[in-house]
């Protein structure tokens, strides 16, 4: 089981490297990694399990965040009532199209690999199309909007060596285009 001690923290070089593409069929090691990353997300969103194991809640976890420099990310995205609206493990994902219109979370973003609060809006495309493979090697493309699009962008950024705060406007962290959708 992945615990907080297993999460690589900001400053580790693996977080700034472009992740290596995986080939199919996935090895048992990478299939287990996918399962373990999803298990962390499920456990972290369960208040009792999270408290017992001192897990910080997460909606996404990329392989580099657990020290594996490969292109894989688990996503478990709830709605505002806690119901899961998107659950998937991406292998070799890429955003193949995105909207011009941006969106962001009203409270900014956080990251399991970043221990401090970094204030500022993180503008991302409101709609994205993600092309990826499943753990079983099935090729897919999915169109996402709003919060699932934000989470997908955050995790795919990890696979490209970027952290959320790289997207914050350094001059004015709370500046937004006037048509940006703010999710509360």
Swiss-Prot record:
Enzyme class: hydrolase
Catalytic residues identified in the record: 155
SUPFAM superfamilies found in the cross-reference section: Peptide deformylase
Cofactor note: Binds 1 Fe(2+) ion.
Family annotation (CDD domains): Pep_deformylase
Gene3D superfamilies named in the record: Peptide deformylase (3.90.45.10)
Signal peptide positions (record): none
Catalytic activity entry: N-terminal N-formyl-L-methionyl-[peptide] + H2O = N-terminal L-methionyl-[peptide] + formate
Residues the record lists as binding Fe cation: 111, 154, 158
GO BP term (any one): co-translational protein modification
InterPro entries the record matches: Peptide_deformylase, Peptide_deformylase_sf
Transmembrane intervals: none
Cofactor field: Fe(2+)
PANTHER family: PEPTIDE DEFORMYLASE, PEPTIDE DEFORMYLASE 2
Function summary: Removes the formyl group from the N-terminal Met of newly synthesized proteins. Requires at least a dipeptide for an efficient rate of reaction. N-terminal L-methionine is a prerequisite for activity but the enzyme has broad specificity at other positions.
HAMAP family hit by this protein: Pep_deformylase
Designated name of the protein: Peptide deformylase
Originating species: Lactobacillus delbrueckii subsp. bulgaricus (strain ATCC BAA-365 / Lb-18)
Record lineage: Bacteria, Bacillati, Bacillota, Bacilli, Lactobacillales
